[in-house]
């Protein structure tokens, strides 16, 4: 009882890996057995087919051997026997018969007769059986390559081939003559503010310009919620413009606050995503040739490859500020507007009477940036530039200038057009109310001061950062067709290609001759050697 249980327990705890191995071995043996049986069946079928073909050939040969004497051979022998008998009978009729002589006279035999004439040509025999095909002869020798054939006629033009690979850029040609001056281009974009220059000498006070036209007054914006008065904070560092928040709900009307100071110009908005490129337009008809232009200026100004600088005109003078209007209610923060076009310079007014010398005026503000000079020579290659974020912060710091003092209040302007409602800005800290100052009397213009001394030359500034790529210029007029260039030199011979892959075995040739003729030095059979 215990032994049986132990045996059962031992059988139950068999290794599963050994069971899998045994099953795999059994499956392999079964596959080998099936493969062997299949191979035996195929070999047996092929052997039976070969045996049947051999038996059929032997039976056919036996039938031919048995039917030979009684059939074709008997007919052939019968015709020959009939021909021989007919010739013999004809010959017997033409021979002289032996004279009958008595038996007592024994004459010697006469001389032998002359040889008879050849007999007539016999009738053609029956056609024999068709012989079997001969065994294939040996392969013939390769013939020598033939002479090149005559040049063929000119073929029809073929289809356009595929576009070739782009060739290498040719050497730069000599500079062409200066072209005629182009038409005045559109006003360029407002450039970035350059670095602040050194303090120049105090210039003479200019004459007051005419009052500008009164600008249209905008509609009063919605009033925001009154903010909690906070302490006046220190001036913060100008940071990058944040993303505009979603437009909030309209607030309740608040109390009318005191007049605020002029706000700082908003930072420029982020660059929008590029639009989808438009489809290529159809090529228009070619216009008539234009009239010959006048002779252009032969002075060549090198703009260092910057075609936009060549098309840009000098910056116009700054227009006179208009009178300030009545302050309206504080509106919501609007979107940053596009930079406006510089106004035209107003006409110079009549010269006034010389006034009495007045007291020395306060130190004047920094003058406007002068016209851009001619481009200087290329400097040495600078070091690696800083990241774009630092450049953006620096450019924003240059754009955001300190606010000037508030101007005197002007007459109310007419109602302006409805502006685009911008996103609601964050509530700013409410500043303390300043004391209203008294308006002082206007001072008399002082005399023109003597010109200052020429300042010392400043140190050479560092090379500026590379500017952003300019806009594409307007396409110029189409040039005349150039002269045909000379034929280029013959290119070098290409590198020989790799050995090709061995071709497939050729098909068996036609049945050869029993004994091929010898071949001469030219690869052709020797003359006089021929076969039936």
From Swiss-Prot:
This protein's UniProt keywords: Cell membrane, Collagen, Membrane, Repeat, Signal-anchor, Transmembrane, Transmembrane helix
Subcellular location: Cell membrane
Main location as per UniProt: membrane
Domain annotation Collagen-like: ranges: 108-163, 173-232, 242-297, 313-372, 404-452, 455-514
Topological domain spans for side Cytoplasmic: 1-23
Bias-annotated ranges (Pro residues): 174-184, 241-250, 314-326, 403-414
Any one GO cellular component localisation term in the record: collagen trimer
GO molecular function: extracellular matrix structural constituent conferring tensile strength; heparin binding; identical protein binding
Positions of transmembrane segments: 24-45
Residue numbers spanned by region Disordered: 102-532
Composition bias type Basic and acidic residues, residue spans: 342-354, 380-393, 427-441, 478-495
Membrane topology listed for this record: Single-pass type II membrane protein
Disulfide bonds: none
Post-translational modification: Undergoes proteolytic cleavage by furin protease to yield a 60 kDa soluble form that forms a homotrimer and exhibits a low affinity interaction with heparin.
Biased composition (Low complexity): 129-145, 157-172
The keyword Cell inner membrane is annotated on this UniProt entry: no
Record topological domains on the Extracellular side: 46-532
InterPro entries: Collagen, Collagen_Structural_Proteins
Pfam families xref list: Collagen (PF01391)
Quaternary structure (record): Homotrimer.
Protein name: Collagen alpha-1(XXIII) chain
Species in which this protein is naturally found: Rattus norvegicus
